Structures are given as structure tokens and as C-alpha cells.
Amino acid sequence: VGDGQPGGLPDILIRGSNSVTQSNAPLYVVDGIPLESPDNSSIPTQNIKSIEILKDASATAIYGARGANGVIVITTDSGSKGAPKINFEYRYSLSKDYNRYEMMSPYEFVRLQNELDAAYGSMYLDGRDPHPDGTPWTLDDYKNVRPIDWQDEISQLGQMHEYSVSASGGTEKTTYMASFNYANQKGIILNTGMKNYVGSMNITQKIGNRMQLVMRANYAEKERTGMQVNYGQGSSAYMYKVWSYRPISTNGVDLTHELEDPERPESGVPMFNPLLQTQNTDQKYITRQLRTSAMFNWNILKCLKFTTSISYTSTESQTDIFNNSKTEAGSTLPGRNDGINGSRRVTRTNNVLNENTLNFNKKFDNIHDLAVTVGCTQQKNVSDIFEAKAT
């Protein structure tokens, strides 16, 4: 499940909603690196070799409490023996919003306002300037008035361009896989978009007949711009403001150019123009992530295997927001805000993980199986946050 905004992450549930206050998202393990809050766009689908879902006791047996919501194990392609192969892909896609809510016509809207509150609803009849011939407005006159469909005003045809190039090959001892991916998306909401860059390199080296070294590196950078539709409150939070804005103007007022509904304050509930809000939103969300890992496998005996790995993950998230005078947050309307303002927030996280396992697996007399696993894990996680605001 996702909110459909450019670069938005899907909400995946494996074992249902086990908690009301905590995250129900599964643990991701990408090439042996546990990631509790991964950006899926940093893992191009073209590079995925296999996906395994752990949803029973095995998830907690291996990953402890982190696997309580299930585990998604992703392994990326490491290349294969053979002559070098170059692959290039280009994809172009279009997106459009469907299943829109059917909005009230001007006639239906005015009739409802009069039924709910005759005093407030009268501004569309007695309170409106008369026709050029001096006759007052009647309810039936609104049957010929063209409505403002704010869903049309704030939307556009979404487009996405995706480019992917990869090189792979290898010998009996060494295999490799290198790739670069770029995506550029224009969202279905005005002034929204996303750019995504991903580069990765995987090398597998056999050492003798019993040992293997696997090295992986991945760098991803994603930039999202424009209105973020969920605000952490659900995908409809932004659209509620669009659906609730009145579809008609009165007395020559062009609602599409007014930041605040000039009639709405009389009812005690301020309403802000969703079109101007969308057009003037200046928000940028940048995520940069570097993942590196090395894994050493040693088949000591036919029934005994030792594996050790070390990984380093560095993640930086940057949020830049500027609210100008044509936005709700930057307006100087009485009782609203302090005017134009801006902010920057940067979060950096560095994670180092070392895992060591010794596996014994042997079958006795073709009847009995004995499997024993001994492991040791060390992990260090350091985070820091910087934030600045100005008005």
C-alpha cells in the first residue's frame, strides 16, 4: 500500500498490525545487512536475484525482536561466469488519478448551504450582487454556473523516465556485477517530482576450493520535491483540503487567486486555497545512503561452515522547507503565522555491523539430521541531528 506520491515508500505488512503505537513494518535484510527503515528505491528491481519472506518463528529465531513483524530477505545479483555482458534498459510510464470523488455541482452546493445554515447560505442569493438587469440571484440560476473542480486544478498527467545500465561477467574464480540506475518522475500533483540515482558493485572471489569472499557496495541518492501529501496522517490529509474547498465564487472574486477564502472566516473556520498552496510549495527532501559489506565463507569440513561479515551503512536525510507569503505557513494574515519562514533539518546515521556464525549440519545413518548454529553479532549505531529555522 502506498500514497502514490513521487518517491513514496510502500507500506508492507507481513504479520498484520501487531501494535497501535509502534511500527508494523517488517525488517529488511539486503545482502546480509539488516535495514529497519530501508528506502526501497535504493534497490533497483533489475538487480534483485531473489526475495524470501520469513513470517514464522524462524524470523525471531534468527533476528530476535527486530523480526517480530516478519523479515524480507533480498539478495542482489553478483554476476555469473562468462564473457562480459552489457545491458541497457529504458522505461517510460504515465500515471493518472482515477476513482475521483464526484463533487457537488454549484446548484447542489448552494442548496446544501441554505439547508445547513440559511444565514450563511444566503450570501449566494440575497448577498450576491444582482444580475446586470437588476434581478437577484435564485437557486435555479446556479444550474448554469460552471464549477471549479479543485481536483482538476491541482493535478496533471504524471510521467516517469527510467534508465538502467549494467555490466556483468566473470571467470571460474571471479564474478562481478556493476550497475547504474536513474529515474526522473513528475507526479500527478502539480509541483511534485522525484529524481533517483543508484550505483552498485558486487564482486565474488573464490579462494581455493573451500573459501569465498563477497564484496558489495551501493550508493543511492533520492530527491523529492513539492507538496508531501501524507504529513504522517494518511494519504488523504492533503486531499481533504482539496475536496472541502467551495466550487464557486461570488461577487466577481476569483477564488483561484485568493490565498484564503474571503467568505470563510465569517463561519469561523479559515480555508486556504489548495491550488496556490500547491503551486508555491517549496519543499525538498534528499536522502543519501552508502552501503558497503564484505563476507567471508569457509567450508572447514563438508559438514562445518564458518561465515563472518562486516558492513557499514551511512545514511543522511535532509529536509529543506521554505514557506513564502502565498502559503498558509508563510502568510501574514491576522492570527495565522509570523510570515515568510524557512528551515533545514539534517539527520545522519552511521551503522557498523559484524556477524559471525558457525554452522554444523550432518546426517547420520540416512535417518537422523543434526543441525547446530552458533553465532555472535556486534553492532554500533550513531546518529546526530542538525536543525535550523529562520523567519
Residue ranges and their predicted role:
Residues V1-S200, Q205-A220, R291-T292:
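Short, small/polar-rich motifs associated with maturation and membrane association
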Residues S80-R146, G187-T192, V198, N202-R291, ...:
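Surface-exposed loop/interface segments of Gram-negative outer-membrane beta-barrel transport/assembly proteins
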